[in-house]
């Protein structure tokens, strides 16, 4: 593990930072002479003129630390020597005292050069909003829930995140797509018609009468008891138990009277899905409700729906139609456990009209029918008794903003909008530029609403909106790279909300208050507690723990027949809620490695073999030791994203643990080394294959680190189930643990356990967790680095290591609390400087 900075190193850093340019050059020359002597005696046989292992030649490596590429080579040398990996153990090494003196000198040189670059160039280059940030910024700025992310090109990833400036390039495709996205979002702000009150209640019987295909269900997986519909299976997707589809987009109130039957006193898990595809998309699950036995219960909620969408109800713990009637089963009515639906009701839209977005863009400008707006713009009088409008009339005469003073209104609205969009005060000359765009459009007889949307669109596609600009605070002369208050507000907002600063942040920025530690801490707390704070958990944890990849693989149904959509939905929720709880309660970050609790529902608990968890709703559960669970490593979502749909790989999982949990990513494999393909015949075990692989010198040095955590996790299959043996494709079937009645083919025994690079043996994942927990500082170091990368949009640089070690020390003092670490990151030099 990476060693902490010693006092001698810190002292050297201070002294080296004070050295002037010419003196620094002399020190570099002195270091180069010192290093050359060591290199000739101990390094050039592998890294010299005749042989350059890892592409590194040390006898000619200049001490030009100001050059980024050269400095990067020196950092590799420093890290390998510091870890004791070089020179190799079977080679003669220089005296320890000589090595340490050299390392102290090298660290100081690298730190000084890196810090100098940061103080002159800044550590974060200009970065654009990624597509998630662009969408959330539009939503918050315009007050709309429009989905524009899908219109934008995928973002590249660097250092584990998609908001790192170095990877966020800009192409012509981006510029075109940003225009499309801005246009789509802006168009949703202007309603084409006033809302039409809509309310419809359907009894269970009426649900079946609305679609003739229900006749196929009745008498099989469903039946009627008077007006009540009893569902004993989950219907096919084209036979929904659903509300009426809504006529227009908006927020709707949904209610239903339901109860469970035949459940032996236990609740039945019911899901509500928003969809126009009849509930097939688990990503759009609105809620899970536990429905009690026999007692009619009113379930209600308020949900945003698009036109023609409806809300589908289904008993999620009921069998599917295929499970009930497929595979040669008799096609007869089934009874027993079921969901009784007395009625469903939908009402809305219940939003405030016009929506907040319209008020933000057109405050004080009334909405009128297009014909009336044209008359107002032309100065013609309106008819004294206009005909009463019907909903259909707005199809050919939609509502538009109608201004009697378009030039004055355009200037007023734009000058108010631009500082919000650009996240800081806007120079008058720049404001005039956007005002002129709209005035020119008005002069060309463009309707007022269209002219304003043109001005807004140009602003939302401008560099001032697309890029996060971070000017320094000119008033703080003692710190040439200190961010100004508006830059701090923006950095904090995109860190915690993935979006633009709100009014409170901008007001504090205007007063210069955000440079005060107590104010910054209070704002961090406020933002984490805000509903928008969920975006930090979703976007940071989604990338750190690879939850975004949960859909990347589909378990083979012939091998993992127990995998279903209920389990799939529950997997990432466990990890997301687990992350949220550690952050909310400032729990120690060691809980990410091991905990005696997690968030489960009945489906996930059954999968884990944990008893006494009833119902579909997720809740905090005490874990049993026998379950071998606790922390993120043993959660089904993580075990799924680190495997393919058929088999596991100790290499993939081991690499994941090194990168994500330990923060010690292995070097990429040599280009001429083939990947290991598991022997699907079962003749050769994965350990035997890896042992052979490790006989290659180029592979052994990395695999001694990769393989131990990988084999520690081999007792978990591709969907996170515990296993003592691999599944085969033939042979004698045995019953699958935790799934009574389900059979699988038994293969070879699972190979688990191993030995750490330091020679410490471990039996299984429970043992290996203790290996990780023995170095809490490294766990803190890893998370500190990842938070710094994500919060600033730049990878860790050498000068940042000093700050990272300061964060680790503070974390140790605060018992490794995760929320405390996040606060310290926000207060750090790296976060508050360009």
Where are the language model's segments positioned?
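N-terminal secretory signal peptides that target proteins for export/translocation
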Residues: 1-7
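Bacterial N-terminal signal peptides
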Residues: 9-21
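Low-complexity, glycine/serine/threonine/alanine-rich intrinsically disordered linker
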Residues: 26-56, 69-76, 80-85, 89-834
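Active-site donor-binding loop signature of nucleotide-sugar glycosyltransferases
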Residues: 60
